[in-house]
Amino acid sequence: MCIDGICSNVNFKKYKLNIMTIAVDFDGTCVTHDFPKVGKNIGAEIVLKKLADKGHKIILYTMRSHPSEKTENAEVSGMTSTTNDCLQDAIDWFAKYGIPLYGVNDNPSQHSWTDSPKVYANMYIDDAALGIPLVYEDMKHIYDSSMIRPYVGWVRVSEMLYESGVLTYNDLMDIIEEFNKRY
């Protein structure tokens, strides 16, 4: 199957769940990499808002944390966020775009059936996940000469969500239209 010149031989099965729990990373996934600051928007807010409006439960699943002794050590090395609370900065980003969070590094419903620390979700969206579409262009954040940090390509992710039955065709067209207006 090809969409806009992007071809895939993956045969996506249709999800039969009415409401999905979706765990989403933050840096490189919702925004560009600029830790400990919040990076630039890359379209995640459009897709995640659409998913939340359809009733899907969004869990922020990130390495960001509230201040602690470890993060105080990071301050000494010049790694500070705007509010000195990297996790709260990410939570505030979701609130700014009207995206309700079902959980933060936690799935509240799983505690009744497991003690596992891994957050349970039906789907994980993370720039480090195998197969996630990434954008390598316009990279301004070069940490060293051999490492460029790509970020998630949200138009392609929305197409994958459509292909798998999570979004409707109209949802996809709304997302692409909004993406074209903003970016």
Where are these regions (language model features)?
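HAD-like aspartate-dependent phosphatase fold
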Residues: C2-Y183
